[in-house]
Amino acid sequence: MDDSLDSTAHQDRVLIIEDDERLAHLTREYLEANGFQVELEHDGAHGVERIIEEQPDMVILDLMLPGEDGLSICRRARPHYAGPILMLTARTDDMDQV
């Protein structure tokens, strides 16, 4: 069978949890152009459940979110999710918390 026709080929799945819609969509476009399957979540309150239910290959997580902050999401999701979590922030003072 020709591998180029195999519709079951694995694409790495990325969940972006980011309330800045412009940044989220730019990141999504970049990742999709590089072969990733991307899902977006804009509300921190739904972040933990999405991580646990979807088990993406990687999570990109903003620190400052409405509903629940990124550090809380990370702490609550980590016991149920072993994949990488990349933290985003525009503020340098947030780095001390991470």
Show where each model-derived region lies:
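N-terminal/domain-start alpha-helical segments
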Residues: M1-V98
